[in-house]
Amino acid sequence: GGVHGMERIGSQILLAWLENLLARCQWDEGLLHLLSKVRLVCIPLLNVGGLLKSTRSNPNGVDLMRNAPVEAQGFTAWPLGGQRLSPKLPWYRGQKNQLEIESQVLVRYVQEKLLGQPFSLAMDCHSGFGLRDRIWFPYASHRQAPPHLAEAVALREVFNNTYPNHSFYLMEPQSLNYSTHG
């Protein structure tokens, strides 16, 4: 959460969820059993500087969502997909081949904690696109179906069946809307 400093809801959701988990650990033996079998990794706030400045980007003017070692394949909507012209324009990716410190820490953390595990599920919680709330599947760097699409669709069906009145959420691959660097 907190990749975009001004989008505070993602951090708040993660913190509320963690508070709920901790409170349930007092009495929920099923949850305790589950937590003894899995590793839970959470970063509620990545962009501390952006939060303090109330900006989307970090203090260097870099949009951390676009500052990653991933280049989009094919067409990206400029500047939405990321641009390198100026940190004064939105969606600035930073200098080529230079990750911001926040991005370096995140990449290293994912490599150490998630990669190499038999199964991992990553979720990015942030707000802000269009007039409809969305829950997007990852891999927006290309238009091909993301890996494990069947599993993502199955999770969507579980969510739909568990929360049948949530019709305000649109769940789909992000790349159906636009491709992006990062």
Task: Give the ranges of each region predicted by the language model.
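Structured catalytic-domain cores with a bias toward divalent-metal coordination
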Residues: 1-182
